[in-house]
Amino acid sequence: MKFLHLADLHLGKRVNGFDLLEDQRYILEQILALCDSNKVDAVVLAGDIYDAPVPPAPACTLLDWFLTQLAARRIAVLAVSGNHDSAERLDYAAGLLANQNVYIAGQFRGAPRQIVLNDRFGPVEFTLLPFVRAATVRHYMPEADLPDYDSAVAAALSACAPSAERRVLVAHQMVVAGLCPPQLSGSETAPLTVGTVDSVDAAHFAGFSYTALGHIHRAQRVGSDTVRYAGAPLCYHLDECGTEKSATLVRLGRRGVDGIDTLPLHPRRAMRHIVGPLAKLVEHPADTGDYIWATLTDPTPQPDAMAVLRAAYPNAMRLDYRPQGAEILPADTAQSVRGKPFASLFEDFFTQMNGRPLTVEEARAVKALREEASK
């Protein structure tokens, strides 16, 4: 059996105000071509199918088209909800869709859904575990001792008995290998407690031939070659610029995984980060249709900078300043800034943008403006 592992489609997503629906359709057409050329038997969608609990109507139409194309090819679909999805809405018509070999597990109902597909070697069990919170598991298991997220997910998995030797888990969770968290991107919503109470140890998946994960937008293995995040099929953030997106092709043999291939995906428009003075960036623009994140190194803000940039790059998404010579400081996290006084936050920001601290006079002016604004 061959199946394609996908995740984090985020249909309907907008990045800096840009609607990416046509880009998403373009990449789904590529995925269908990969299904055809590799003669896959199934497609796994490991959560965050939509970008929002109430997706825009065109996103729903796009998913309908994609599932219809797969069903017409007699390719089974095994999908779970993610933290961005509405589990209840994703479950709509799930029973009817199952008649077309489209199996969707939106809500957790006390145990993962188990689907058995067959190939020439016999049955393959797909265990579908949607994104679930510890409180939801406790609701179904009130007598169990489930002190944290890890124990709750472990209990959820133990609620179903294996029905085949070859087993594939489909899940949308934050998974770590021991104390090693996955490599995050700026576009996914990840808990600040990665590696502690809001993560799941990959050791719980030892009984599965392959674990198909969603939630993290960079394709990567988690401790083992057979525990993997597929990653998002498109770049959705500045720090994903330059990363190669892919779909994961898994081949199952008689005893388990026979091979795993990473199949490159090529976007309709690349997402790029360009750095330099505004005049230089627009002097000889290249690949002008790309999505552009620009960092200007001009010593002072430039008049109508975004308008000038978009005259050269119509799809310029965002513009930031980092004057030449300014110290590049690590980005603040929510944890590092929480509780910090306004004056300290502003001074850190000013230093990062200008390469020098506030003078005494500037600090006084900022304080006065702050007090005036608070009245």
Predicted regions, residues:
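Active-site environment of divalent metal-dependent phosphoester hydrolases
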Residues: 12-13, 51-53, 80-90, 110-113, ...
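N-terminal active-site segment of His-dependent metallophosphoesterases
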Residues: 1-68, 72, 363, 368-375
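Accessory, non-catalytic peripheral segments of nucleic-acid enzymes
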Residues: 37, 42, 251-375
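Active-site neighborhood of phospho(di)ester-bond hydrolases with catalytic His/Asp-centered motifs
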Residues: 6-7, 43-48, 76-83, 103-108, ...
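Metal-dependent catalytic neighborhoods of phosphoester/phosphodiester hydrolases
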Residues: 15-16, 49-66, 81-101, 106, ...
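Conserved beta-sheet core of the metallophosphoesterase superfamily
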Residues: 177, 181-258
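Conserved catalytic scaffold of divalent metal-dependent phosphoesterases
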Residues: 92-194, 233, 253
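Binuclear metal-dependent phosphoesterase catalytic core
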Residues: 112-125, 129, 227-291
